[in-house]
């Protein structure tokens, strides 16, 4: 808890809260404790545009605050999901902001320099995640879904190269993949360079298979077809093909991409 309070952005926001509000980080022990406190609580999480590199120690660009849950909770307990159940008013500047985001290749992590992908053949992208990540547990996923995702990508795209984008934590923090060694070494599969940015991945892959990774939302912003296998904030609004095993959390309406960007990147972050 002390480490959370030392976070400069948390510290600034916490000073504005009632002293009776309990707070914690996402669904880590501090956040779960705050949520179970029986009173008002605030949960902090990484935003859609976080930092240069993943992990701890680097400068962080922003933070999200949620009075109900986290945006990757399949139960739908989140201020973001609650807002998306209603109308989203798109501000006049938002289309230009989204276009600028796309043109600059901005992502959650921004450590990669632009790369020349002309030597790659256009193909299909599978997005890996870090084994044990909270969005897997709370996003209605288990590891059998990564097997389904992998098998579907190969079966549905028999003539296309299959690329896998591993999570940056695999390079920076030695986190394990959600795919087996056999899958990663499959003859039709190529592991993309760790320092290839999401924006460059989307230049060579216009179809993307994803669990709950935020790269799925980034793929939508870059105009890709997105197939999901878990329930994150961008699934279920009519923009994605959804194959999650768990029942879809209630979605009261559909949204355009610009409405989703307004809600997730402007209002919530």
Predicted feature locations:
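Catalytic-core helical/loop segments in enzymes performing group transfer/polymerization on anionic/lipid-linked
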Residues: 1-269
């Amino acid at each position: 808890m002390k480490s959370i309070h030392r976070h400069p952005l948390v510290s600034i926001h916490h000073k504005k809260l009632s002293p009776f509000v309990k707070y914690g980080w996402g669904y880590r022990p501090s956040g779960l404790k705050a949520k179970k406190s029986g009173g008002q609580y605030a949960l902090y999480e990484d935003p859609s545009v976080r930092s240069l590199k993943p992990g701890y120690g680097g400068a962080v660009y922003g933070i999200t605050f949620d009075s109900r849950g986290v945006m990757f909770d399949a139960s739908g307990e989140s201020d973001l999901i609650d807002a998306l159940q209603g109308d989203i008013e798109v501000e006049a500047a938002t289309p230009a902001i989204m276009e600028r985001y796309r043109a600059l290749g901005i992502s959650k992590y921004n450590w990669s320099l632009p790369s020349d992908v002309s030597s790659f053949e256009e193909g299909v992208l599978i997005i890996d995640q870090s084994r044990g990540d909270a969005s897997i547990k709370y996003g209605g996923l288990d590891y059998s879904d990564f097997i389904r995702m992998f098998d579907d990508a190969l079966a549905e795209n028999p003539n296309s190269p299959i690329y896998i984008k591993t999570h940056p934590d695999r390079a920076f923090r030695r986190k394990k993949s959600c795919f087996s060694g056999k899958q990663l070494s499959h003859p039709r599969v190529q592991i993309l360079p760790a320092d290839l940015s999401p924006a460059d991945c989307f230049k060579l892959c216009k179809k993307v298979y994803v669990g709950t990774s935020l790269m799925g939302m980034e793929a939508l912003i870059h105009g890709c077809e997105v197939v999901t296998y878990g329930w994150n904030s961008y699934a279920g609004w009519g923009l994605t093909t959804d194959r999650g095993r768990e029942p879809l959390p209630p979605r009261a309406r559909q949204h355009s991409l610009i409405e989703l960007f307004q809600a997730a990147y402007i209002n919530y972050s």
